[in-house]
Amino acid sequence: MSDFKQSGTIVTFPRLRPRDEAQREKELVTHARRTPLALIIPCLVSELEQPALAGMVARLAGTPYLDTAVISLDRADAAGYARALEYFRALRLRTMVVWNDAEPVAAIIREIEMAVLNLGPRGKGRAVWVALGAVIAEERAEAVAFLDADVVTFERSLLTNLVYPILHPALDFDYAKGYYARYSDRLHGRVTRLMVRPLLQALLNTVGHHPYLEYVDSFRYPLSGEFAVHATLLRRLRIPSDWGLE
């Protein structure tokens, strides 16, 4: 999955050669003046105890091209929310912590469900959906990136490379999804290998040529939680609120 072959209906950018990270960030700072970037990280309060999130916060701290970090916090009581506020000060960025267990948020959810639609069970999808609503309502960000809170090997270059095609005005991309090679003595990506790929192939064999199925099948890591979207596309998408995997 780490080769340079272009297949399917999307463009795949491998890391062909290393570049000066500082220079790339400097370019993004310039582009972000025109296209402000928000970063959404959904997380459980229990993840504040994990080294993965601590490492991510340390590496994201002071990211110069980031306008706003939005933390969608789940399963937290008042003490957990207060701890999260203090914890994410280390980002040294404009930061919004959305407390999904707070009564005002619950009241908004109830109002939506009574007036419009059933949002389904709580989970990662709901956390992302609520955070997206907050970002769109602010009308401040013109691009949004998403990261999982448990990326043990996270480096800031992952975010830089992810958002570069979205923020660079000459590249004209509206959506980017991350993928990466994992080298170890274990087989990773069991859900993708054992369920997603066979399911997509079965659907293609049954339905035949279908643009959407071929589009999804083109991604190296279709379940990757790292992706970025331009706001013009984001506002047009009907994003569900009840998913558990991407």
What is the role of each PLM region?
Residues 48-52, 120-128, 155, 191-195:
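Phosphate/oxyanion-binding active-site loops and adjacent basic polyanion-contact surfaces
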Residues 152-181:
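Conserved donor-nucleotide/metal-binding helix-loop-beta segment in metal-dependent transferases, i.e.
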Residues 65-77, 96-102:
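Short beta-strand/loop segment that forms part of the nucleotide-sugar
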Residues 44-49, 76-78, 151-154, 182-184:
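Short acidic, S/G/P-rich loop/turn micro-motifs used as interaction or catalytic elements
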Residues 80-140:
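Active-site-proximal specificity loops/subdomain of glycosyltransferases
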Residues 1-62:
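N-proximal low-complexity "stem/linker" segments adjacent to membrane-targeting elements
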Residues 138-152:
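Short beta-strand-to-loop acidic/aromatic patch adjacent to the donor-nucleotide binding site
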Residues 187-246:
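Conserved catalytic loops of nucleotide-sugar-dependent glycosyltransferases that act on lipid-linked
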